[in-house]
Curated annotation (Swiss-Prot):
This is UPF0386 protein HNE_3437. HAMAP family: UPF0386 (MF_00827). The lineage of its organism: Bacteria, Pseudomonadati, Pseudomonadota, Alphaproteobacteria, Hyphomonadales. Belongs to the UPF0386 family. It comes from Hyphomonas neptunium (strain ATCC 15444). It comes from the Bacteria. InterPro entries: YjhX_toxin.
Amino acid sequence: MDISRAEQRILHLLAQGGRIDLVRDEAGKLTDAHCYSRDGWRYTGLDMALFRKLKRRRTIASERGQPYRITRRGLQLVRSQPDNC
């Protein structure tokens, strides 16, 4: 399965130890998703449409309320590259 360049960038960042944190409003509805590198830097290339696409393809998952991380399937799909360019 081919994945887009934007998906590739997010998965590569997650494969290096990054995470995706969800932002919810007062009613508990999902409003935004923030992607962080392992160093704590926020990556701005993640929007809700891309988050849903990654989740639907089962390349990311959350366990026990923790931030979203890359799955084994996501690791198989990601291609190696020296940086996130």
